[in-house]
A protein has these predicted regions:
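Acidic (Asp/Glu-rich) sequence patches and key acidic residues
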Residues: 1-147, 151-159, 174-176
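Glycine-rich, aromatic-bearing surface loops/beta-hairpins
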Residues: 167-170
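Short helix-terminating capping/connector loops at secondary-structure junctions
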Residues: 160-164
Length: 176
């Protein structure tokens, strides 16, 4: 038994149940980190030599390097394609990397995840004031954020229903 604590909080958009969100893999593939980028962004418990053959990996596995914990990554390495059916969850966790790249925001100024109830979400997670000035962050308003997130979600999911989703307070919980 444990307690749930708010780990991160910010304004963003809920996409719905993570297992019911379908992603446009062609769009995601265009923004997938190169091997060199993955080496910079990877989780600390993943060794550099474990990225051998990165260029030939399936799309979801490339995103596992930076979005999943080492245990999940090693499970995939030891049992090839065992995580293929979890691609929606993996892509939900990768949304903020793609969004930041598309709109010029600094790395880790947004956060995307799915919570214990399976709700996928992406939200602004920047601490104010940011350490370095960034024009995109400086010009952000709630209206602009909502417009950008809606445009992005329509493109990354290829589903126009996200064009009308409202901004909400999103919270990522941890269980301790």
């Amino acid at each position: 038994m444990g307690w749930y604590h708010v780990n991160r909080i910010g304004k963003g958009i809920f996409l719905g149940n993570v297992d019911e969100v379908h992603y446009n893999e062609d769009f995601i593939a265009k923004h997938t980190p190169t091997k060199d980028e993955a080496l910079e962004l990877k989780q600390r418990d993943i060794r550099d030599d474990e990225l051998e053959g990165y260029e030939t990996w399936p799309l979801y596995k490339k995103w596992m390097v930076i979005t999943q914990d080492a245990w999940s990554f090693h499970r995939e390495v030891n049992d090839a394609r065992c995580c293929a059916d979890e691609s929606s969850q993996i892509y939900s966790d990768a949304l903020h990397y793609i969004f930041e790249k598309c709109y010029g925001y600094p790395l880790n100024s947004f956060f995307s995840t799915h919570d214990y109830d399976g709700n996928a979400m992406i939200f602004c997670d920047v601490l104010w004031p940011p350490k370095k000035h960034n024009e995109a962050l400086a010009a952000m308003t709630e209206e602009k954020l909502q417009t950008q997130l809606r445009e992005f979600l329509v493109e990354v999911t290829d589903d126009s229903k996200y064009a009308s989703f409202p901004l909400r307070v999103c919270e990522d919980y941890i269980k301790e």
